[in-house]
């Protein structure tokens, strides 16, 4: 899955 926990990925923020 596409996880992203840093502010640059706010549009698809997923932790």
From Swiss-Prot:
**GO function terms (MF aspect):** acetylcholine receptor inhibitor activity; ion channel regulator activity; toxin activity
Disulfide bridge map: 4-9, 5-15
Q: Where in the cell is it found?
A: Secreted
Where on the tree of life does the source sit, at the highest rank? Eukaryota
- State the tissue distribution: Expressed by the venom duct.
Give the keywords, sorted.
Answer: Acetylcholine receptor inhibiting toxin, Amidation, Disulfide bond, Ion channel impairing toxin, Neurotoxin, Postsynaptic neurotoxin, Secreted, Toxin
| Keyword Iron-sulfur (UniProt) | no
Q: Write down any Gene Ontology CC term.
A: host cell postsynaptic membrane
What does the UniProt record say this protein does?
Alpha-conotoxins act on postsynaptic membranes, they bind to the nicotinic acetylcholine receptors (nAChR) and thus inhibit them.
Annotated domain remarks: The cysteine framework is I (CC-C-C). Alpha3/5 pattern.
Listed name of the protein: Alpha-conotoxin-like MIA
Q: What is the species listed in this Swiss-Prot or TrEMBL entry?
A: Conus magus
